[in-house]
Amino acid sequence: MANFTAADVKRLRELTGAGMLACKNALAETDGDFDKAVEALRIKGAKDVGKRAERATAEGLVAAKDGALIELNCETDFVAKNAEFQTLADQVVAAAAAAKPADVDALKGASIGDKTVEQAIAELSAKIGEKLELRRVAIFDGTVEAYLHRRSADLPPAVGVLVEYRGDDAAAAHAVALQIAALRARYLSRDDVPEDIVASERRIAEETARAEGKPEQALPKIVEGRLNGFFKDAVLLEQASVSDNKKTVKALLDVAGVTVTRFVRFEVGQA
């Protein structure tokens, strides 16, 4: 008996963009395990599976202030454009910058005037008739560069980046923030990539090469090449710079005398 339902198939299709039959077969092959089903679809070459599986359904905005970054969600872009909603986001990120909370729950208890953040969100939610959610928060100390990006002129910022760094070249730090916003780096260095992610990418590269009919003796070299391609895409320091694609981000930072210690990227609608 299958360990999944028609609703599961529909959900996997929405997450990955793969066809209904492909999703059904992937769930059957993996005994209903969603993560393994996504991996199976990637091996079989379903288009854009990895990227679309990271997406979530949400509207809203990101806001930054003094080393704090928040994501505040709503249900429609109509509310995202609402001045009261945007004012609330500014108040929430100011509260985050002042209180430096460890997580979302702690931020909900921080103060906005005579109310808590949680109360302020609940009151506006009741007023405008949409569910509002404080989704996540990041707090960085030290020297920080923030960047917010709008998808269109009539919408509030949907992508936010914080970069914590050492060095005196603020322009270089700003360029890195733009890089992260545009190319969606997930890790700072190769050492930061979890072992299970590397193992999964290696397995996918190997099985994909086999499915393409590559000779067995050539697999190790092919797999290493594709794994290096993954690192160049996912690791910030190994990405080609958007300002000079003949050089890596690391090479340009070395010239500028800047060391990035950590970064975070929030995007509305992304997991």
Curated annotation (Swiss-Prot):
The keyword ATP-binding does not apply. One of its GO terms (cellular component) is plasma membrane. It comes from the Bacteria. InterPro entries: EF-Ts_dimer_sf, Transl_elong_EFTs/EF1B, Transl_elong_EFTs/EF1B_dimer, Transl_elong_Ts_CS, UBA-like_sf. GO terms for molecular function: translation elongation factor activity. Its main location: cytoplasm. Was identified as a high-confidence drug target. Associates with the EF-Tu.GDP complex and induces the exchange of GDP to GTP. It remains bound to the aminoacyl-tRNA.EF-Tu.GTP complex up to the GTP hydrolysis stage on the ribosome. This is Elongation factor Ts. It comes from Mycobacterium tuberculosis (strain ATCC 25618 / H37Rv).
